[in-house]
Amino acid sequence: MDSDSGGSSPFVESPHGEEVQVRGDETNNTYGQDQWKFKYEGLLNEWEIQKIQWQKEKYEFEKRQLAAEDRLRNANDEMDILIQRNQDLVYRIEEEERNRINNDEGNDLKGGAGSMDKGKKQEIEELSRRYEADRFEWKTQNEELDLELKSCKSLISKYEQLLMEQSEKINSLRSEVKNKEDQIAELEVVRQKKDHNITNTEEFRNLTTLKDIIKTHDQYALDLEQSNMRQAEELKRLKSLKESATFWRSENEQLQERIRQLEEVEQQYNEVQLEILELKVNISEWDRFLKEKCQPGDTETAEYTPSDFVRDYEILQNDYKVLNDEFEDLKKETQMVKILNDELAMERNQILNLKNEYEKSIINLEKLNYELEQQKTLSFEECKLLRKQLESIKHKSNHEENDSTKDYEVLIDNYKNQTKDLTSELKRMNDELIGSNRDSSAGSKKRKLRTGDSVNVNLAQKLNTMQIENSNLQKEIHKLKAIIDVLEKKIRLLKENKEKRIRILQQRDSPLLKIQFARKQELDLLKDENKELLSLIENVTENNQNRIDTIPLSAYKSLEFQYQQSQENVVKGEKQLSRLKQIYNKKSLEFIDIVNSMLGFRLEFMLDGRVKIYSCYKPDKYLIANLIDNTLKSNLDAIISDWDELLSLWVVERGQLPCFLATITLRLWELNPI
């Protein structure tokens, strides 16, 4: 109440009351300004993000639209190509018919031409069926692409409408922001007017400096924002350039692929033209060959047909088989003659060896005879000497007794008789040997002459006959070879004229076929799902529905197929895992058996990284090694007396666990009763 009546208190009316109120309003205004700026920036960022997303979607739809138009264009081009090919085939058929009508040939040749016409007609029918199928397929694809274009256009219009609505919202927000900025500027003017009433110049100077600093900061923030906007625009431009570059690169690749396909089609067309020319040349050569084989003198056989050629060829082939069999028989006979000649040569060599042995035995016997003759002469000389000695002895020992002389005479007579018997026996044996040698040599000569003459005569006769037959057969072989060359040339021409068929072998149940079948099935399901989803989107856009309560059946089928594929993959993985487990168990058992047989220990792996080791010499005793704690436990200390000493020596001091196990094995072997 004192404040209303104007009391004397100095704090009734504060000189800075209005300033505090202005500052409070200022803080509230700045807080509202920041809040509006934050909302504006958030909305602007959201608008930019949505704009970029809509631009991307618009670009994708435009790209899809261009791709659909390209596919339509390609389909039309291919339809034009098929129509042109059909027209060319019709023209070729008409030309073939005109040529067939102009060329009047034999009945068999007409039959062949008829078969060729039938083949051409079948080919034309097949091509027409293929043309109709391709045309129907391209028509359906064209309709699908039209539907897709319509859906894309509707989506583009929808997104353009959304863009317009968002741009209107942004414009309204901008107008509100401008109004708020105007209010803030008015408040700033009021605040500056009230700041002029401040008596403290130092505070005013500080406020001006702060205001300048804030202005510089605001200017710096604006510059940063502008640079960020420029960079964002540059980034957008670069992204659009990149997307356009990728699009044109893909377009270039598609064009290159089309050019490559056109080159391949042109090459195939040229190859077909060359094959047609080759067929025409072969037909003309065949006609010329038939005309040359015609016999104009004979009225009944004035035409030489292909059946006549086949008959002549079969006759020549049969003759060739007969002559080939005869030639094989002659080869066998010549081989038999060679074998007989070899046997006779072996017998001759054996006879020559026997002759040499007989001659050697004769020479040896003659040497023996000569030696016996020499011994005979020596014995006669000895007899003479003995007689002389006896006579001398007689003269010297007349006083000896007559009994001794008689004994000597008896001995001498016996010696003479024996020598005579020996000489007579030697003469008899010599005469027998000489006679036997003469008889054997004469008999062998006669036998040789008889057998050799007969064998030589027979061999000479056989050789002469075989040489004559061989010369005749060689002449026939040369003739047959010439005929065979001619027939082979004709067969080669006939084979070249025939239609060439290529068969490609393929496994019936190969993994590649399974994968391709699964991919094809998945692709068909995805295509059906895509079609149904497009139709569903069109229905939603036409009926202006906000949500979809149902899903298409194709989506369920595709998910079911993916689930089946995943189940099959799981089954395959389980089978592979079971096989790997079996292999691992088998290999681990082999490893344990090898360690047991080579090192004398059986290993048993336990939980928590422990290994139990059994010795083959004491199966009831064991060692437990903990690989995590590096500890060792055993019940072998009851058997081995110096267990602790060995453990401290080999494990604690030297750190050699293998040597420790080896010493334990030796100790257990020593303790094991044999």
Swiss-Prot record:
Keywords: Cell cycle, Cell division, Coiled coil, Mitosis, Nucleus. One of its GO terms (biological process) is cell division. Its main location: nucleus. InterPro entries: Mad1. Residues 51-586 form a coiled coil. Transmembrane segments: none annotated. GO terms for cellular component: kinetochore; mitotic spindle; nuclear envelope. Pfam families: MAD. Residues 1-31, 102-121, 431-450 are annotated as: Disordered. This is Spindle assembly checkpoint component MAD1. It comes from Nakaseomyces delphensis. The gene is MAD1.
